[in-house]
Amino acid sequence: SLEVAYDTQEEVYTAMFTELDDVIASLQDNLSLPSDAFGRYDGVYSGNISQWLKFANSLKLRMAMRLTEVKPDLAKSKAAEAIAAGVITTNADNAMMHTSDNRTTLIYNDWGDHRIGADIINYMNGYNDPRREKMFTTVTLVENGQEIQGYAGIRIGINVTSKAQTVSSYSNMRVTGTDPYLWMNAAEATFLRAEYELRWGSAETAGTLYEQAVTLSFEE
């Protein structure tokens, strides 16, 4: 059928908030359990339920701040709930799935289907951002007639005529087979808190949180 009924975005978000609140309540009910109760099967936090709670609240905060332009009252109330309950604030609590076989290496390193966009590369190049070394691979560039190693991003929508030539001309994500899958980190949660303060709280607090988020990103 060409007339399939779809849930509205509002219905989807409402259901997601309900499910997430149910999960948070369940986690809170099990806070007293020792970490070894779930640790064997938990590749993210090794059974630490307090850390799972921080991640769940951080997800709620992320969802809430995506509603600021369409449901500002709901965004504010849900974000306030999440912040009050406690979100990720340190890199030690970052949500990462640990693995000995990160399969995204197939996408980035083997198949060569992805390269870094010019927008982020140009921005970070402009600030000589030291995080590039940890995030991206280098490529050979020509500057003043000399070959150098640097970072180059590909423009969105560019016409790729030769994949082999293209993949060697632009920087890639730096990913190894033992890298964890990052789901959410303290920097993102802190940037979201800064946005919350900027919209509904204190501009001074927003500035402080913004700087904290930048620091957390560099420390990571």
Model-derived regions, located:
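Structured, solvent-exposed acidic/aromatic patches
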Residues: 1-220
